[in-house]
């Protein structure tokens, strides 16, 4: 599919309006993008979510095309690419600033970006994991809605999202789109703290048996459900938020 436009190397498959840019907190570089980088790129970074993804993907007989929905700054996209080096990895997000950071870090290797991050990390008593950034993953980044991806039917083996479910506005069409792009036997992996911010979401998805039933009714079966605690470290003194993360691995039937 041909993109609507390309901005600094990032193809757009969704025509994001000026007002949408202004209203999107994930387009705020200082308050959101840098904090997202702090979560994943310091020596104190989270790792259990990555471990869960890798373990689930390894269980699938074929993992040659992998999609991350809501890839942010590309940490999981890059690490999955490193782990499964022969696979084609797509990272989609609706934030241009997040995608731009991901491209600068993993594809363009911009030293100025590393310098900005180093200064930000040092301000909080942390250090940037420069060695990790030496990776050169094989991944493609694009701005797109996860409910309408620029991919052909049944071309994907693994589709996953991290810390996204409680932010999706249209969960039904999100799951239906994952069902469309996944081959039969492909995996849909969803994980996150499920920290819902309104009464309706809590009533809809919690307890999690409701979420599982919802996804299964749309053409999947649950093959794994796990939970773990993950620290989001703020500074060099290890001040942090402890997230209670839930992970689900579904197979398309």
PLM features: residue spans?
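N-terminal auxiliary segments of SAM/dcSAM-dependent transferases
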Residues: 1-24
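Conserved beta-strand signature within the Rossmann-like core of class I S-adenosyl-L-methionine
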Residues: 185-193
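A short glycine-rich, Lys/Arg-flanked "PGG" loop and its adjoining helix->strand segment in the class I
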Residues: 172-184
